Amino acid sequence: MTDTARRYVALHPGDPAPWFVQRTTSSPRFGFDLAAGRYVVLCFFGSAADPAAQAALGAIARSRAEFDDERACFFGITLDPADESSGRLRDTLPGIRFFCDFDASIARLYGAAPSDVRPGEKQVPLRRFWLVLDPGLRVMRAFAFAGAGGGHNAVLDYLRALPPPDLVQGFAVPPPVLFLPNVFEAEFCRDLIAAYEADGGTESGFMVEADGKTLMQLDPRQKRRRDFSLQDPQLVSGVQARIERRIAPELRKVHQFTPTRIERCIVSCYAAADGGHFSAHRDNRSKGTAHRQFAVSINLNDDFDGGGLGFPEYGGQTFKMPVGCAAVFSCSLLHRVTPVTRGRRYAFLPFLYDDAAARLRLSNNRFLGDDVPVYQDPILEDAS
């Protein structure tokens, strides 16, 4: 079967680049969606043993300074297991990584390998090319390998000519976030902080997907925070009433969305003494969190430095909301909390979702690991 008879995915400028999870030479599980927030250069070269691939990788090596994980990063995609076993390819951080795509799953997604590749098929016809993605992981331009130079210099010249990532549209674009002042009164914020202080909270983890299960993971390199779950019925009902009265109407107006459920009533603390922070992440990327629709972040105090809320897909700006002000945003947005450098940042951090998402959450109980509490919904369970 010839190359032209095979079916290949075709990506064009403006198309969203497919997300995937794959191993790199230094990471057993790398979620590509977390690369957003900078220009991304992808190179589908097949095997580093190939002279054309060597020329491409040589061009990257000569331009090492371009890839700092701030303005830009590079991902090479190899289909050759010998590239890893021989040590020909190694991640060099910051900025340069290699995906071990030995099952051609990435190559199929991006059109480097035919989408109809059969398991165990030998001599897969490979299309070698470069892709440059914008900070939102949309395709900007593709470059084919061509001749001895392989078009490699053209890719790098194009990258160097791009504006700063914050100005890729020609102007700064604010993140799609609702900022709602006075959701919590100052006195109510103090009551929530007092409830946290009386308990002290526990170390907070985050959800990961492994072997089809959603698991809780603790990793202070990714997240350092302590959480306290509210137990006082008066405080819980006070939170619920204020969200229903002051956040839900704005969600209906702006997003035509009506929340009917709140996940977790927690007061959280990012402390400078602990190196409090949360690296870039999305809140709904596992089966156990897929129901989450909107995240809410309400600052309960302002006597701290650092701890800004940022959205890397929309630039490097971070936000420090006034006391009682809510930031409300889609759980699909990449976001982070910068390190707190002085004092403590206290925040109330629930997730909102609707009836359909509640049914999804209930059905996904079977995907929860043993360390994740099973979801119960009396309303849905009674209805069934």
Regions found by a protein language model. Give the residues of each.
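Chalcogenol-based redox active-site neighborhoods
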Residues: 2-165
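Short coil/loop residues immediately preceding or within conserved phosphate-binding loops
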Residues: 17, 127-128, 262, 295, ...
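Fe(II)/2-oxoglutarate oxygenase catalytic core
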Residues: 135, 153-326, 335-384
